[in-house]
């Protein structure tokens, strides 16, 4: 399993990923599942059927409004990473076709409630 870490620039809001133990100076590290918010609306729900991976954000559907939405879903596999960007008014879900890859974890980023992760 990798040691991907996520960071956010407090001034511009950009999200960066890093690998390894060296922190990214000037950026705030995001720790998954630590924001006081509704887990049932934020934890990724993952369904794997063969090489098709379906991710729905929350067991209760997350809102997708311009002021509160899921910006992206990222799937970590034994071979790398796959990201799907979302927009307000879209369903908070993503489908990935990953032949020959095993899903390790799924992350999502909410513009208000931060980073969330489900490990498989």
Tell where the protein language model's regions lie, with residue ranges.
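Short strand-edge motifs at loop-to-beta-strand transitions and within beta-strands
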Residues: 92-96
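Short metal-coordination and nucleic-acid-contact micro-motifs, chiefly zinc-binding Cys/His arrays
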Residues: 2-8, 19-22, 106
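Short amphipathic, basic-aromatic surface patches that mediate peripheral association
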Residues: 57-65
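Transition segment at domain starts
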Residues: 16-52
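Short, aromatic- and glycine-rich surface loops/edge beta-strands on solvent-exposed regions
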Residues: 102-112
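Short cysteine-rich clusters marking metal-coordination/redox-active sites
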Residues: 9-12, 22-26, 110
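Extended low-complexity, serine/threonine- and proline-enriched intrinsically disordered segments
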Residues: 69-79
């Amino acid at each position: 399993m990798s040691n991907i870490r996520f960071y956010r620039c407090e001034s511009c809001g950009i999200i960066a990923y890093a690998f390894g133990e060296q922190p990214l100076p000037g950026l705030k590290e995001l720790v998954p599942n630590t924001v006081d918010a509704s887990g049932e609306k934020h934890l990724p729900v993952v369904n794997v059927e063969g090489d098709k991976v379906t991710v729905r954000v929350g067991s209760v559907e997350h809102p997708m409004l311009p002021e509160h939405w899921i910006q992206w879903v990222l799937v970590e596999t034994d071979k790398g990473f796959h990201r799907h960007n979302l927009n307000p008014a879209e369903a908070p879900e993503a489908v990935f076709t990953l032949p020959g890859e095993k899903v390790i974890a799924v992350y999502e980023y909410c513009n208000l409630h931060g980073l969330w992760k489900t490990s498989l």
